[in-house]
Amino acid sequence: MDLQLTGRRALVTGGTRGIGRAIVEVLCEEGAAVAFCARDAAEIAETEQALAGRAGTATGSVVDVADGPGLAQWVTSSGDRLSGIDVVVSNVSALAIPDSEESWRASFEVDLMGAVRMVGAAMPYLERSDAASIIAVSSVSGREIDFAAGPYGAMKAALVHYVQGLAHQLAGKGIRANTVSPGNTFFTGGVWDQIQQGDPALYATALGLNPTGRMGTPQEMATAVAFLASPRSSFTSGTNLVVDGALTRGVQL
């Protein structure tokens, strides 16, 4: 199925690792012009080189999402360079799990306010798009209490609430807003790779909770994001798409 993303203009935060990198890859494969950001210049250059020659384009910038003015400037400059913005993907997380004031502040500034500021800066461009889509990457930790309860889970839950509010506020303007909540996702160098090495008992417990017997991949999460980004999902808004291999037990009403 053609997702009709060819020529669409997308912004992705945290686009050099894990789920964010996979999102940039999938959007490029579908023909989108992607602007992505991260904090490491070397990783940005490697990502750009790896994606050269795809159907779409990928251009990276060094941005710290916790820097509000810097984030807004990147969104504006990217929108001007691309002559518009159709898709916004707020993917970055501080991954601040310890229950400390520092973690709470980091989660608030990066996970929640990073999304709020990104959407605010992109709004003038989204309002001019004929297929605007806002996507925030949340987590199953925002839906159920698990080992990441505390700042990480609380801010991921807040993201779902914020984005569903956007969906209702912006529906009349033709702008869709959704969240994707990944389950445990394994990739080299990621959180679960680190847990597997440092706390194999916790890793085994987490793996055993999933009926599929495995963790998800960044590509599986990115595919869900790409569908919500595409005009093919034109009537999907205000939804929290859980992609977890039946990990969570709660019924989402």
Spans of model-derived segments:
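Conserved glycine-rich cofactor-binding loop
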Residues: 9, 16-17
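Active-site helix of classical SDR
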Residues: 119, 155
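Alpha-helical segment proximal to the catalytic Tyr-Lys
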Residues: 124, 168-169, 234
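Residue(s) in the substrate-gating loop at a strand-loop-helix junction
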Residues: 139
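Short, small/polar-rich loop/turn modules that mediate ligand/substrate recognition or access, typified
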Residues: 171, 176, 236-238
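A glycine/serine/threonine-rich, flexible loop-to-helix segment
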Residues: 172, 182-209, 250-253
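Short C-terminal tail/terminal secondary-structure segment
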Residues: 226, 237-253
